[in-house]
Amino acid sequence: MGQKVSPNVLRLGIVRDWEDTWYAEKDQYVKWLDQDIKIREGVLKLLKDAAVSKIKIERTNSNITLIIRTARPAIVLGQEGKNVSNIATAVQKIAKDRNLKVEVKVIEVKNPDADATLVARWIGEQITNRASFRTVQKLAIRKALKAGVKGIKTSVSGRLGGVEMARTEGYIEGSVPLSTLRADIDYALYEAPTTYGQIGVKVWINHGEVIGGQSQRVSEKAPMNNDRRFNNKNNNRGGRK
């Protein structure tokens, strides 16, 4: 029986790199891994309005480098680097080492409409604000195709529109070859809180095939086709909103 797997994990070492880059002995591995999880949670909490896409961590015994990909670099830096100092202090507190040297590097996401993490978060935030889950998915797909992606797939799950029974609805446009390992697939999951429960938002974006170590991303507008919607078996129950 087939099983689903994260497209990001499936492509590690092939077309994607690890988000943590360090080496540790057995007794130190668990400690550093736990710290990395807490560091990401803490930094995302501090930069909740900065549209952070990914946080890569590189570290040694005495140094740690955070590489933050964001669509709003000015918010990450803050006035006179104030936010950077706050991040460094938070990391030292989590690591319980005041002498730990913390370096923060900021990389700007020039096209947030083609970033799966930012697209999923935007869809989730709109659903939290009571926007139509169908409308926001179509709008996100339209923006992504205009940004030049090869294909995009979206999916929302939960009590859509506040109905009694949970279901899944989504759209797909263009080519999204999840089984092609050389395809540069960007995947993200976001949980949107609503008054009637959590709504899960998933986004898959295809940036093209990786050839010679470089992704063949297009810059021109992709062709617009008719929307193709997929529903699960429970879609006919609970009514349409």
Curated annotation (Swiss-Prot):
Gene3D superfamilies: 3.30.300.20, Ribosomal protein S3, C-terminal domain. This is Small ribosomal subunit protein uS3. Part of the 30S ribosomal subunit. Forms a tight complex with proteins S10 and S14. Belongs to the universal ribosomal protein uS3 family. It comes from the Bacteria. One of its GO terms (molecular function) is mRNA binding. Residues 215-241 are annotated as: Disordered. Pfam families: KH_2 (PF07650), Ribosomal_S3_C (PF00189).
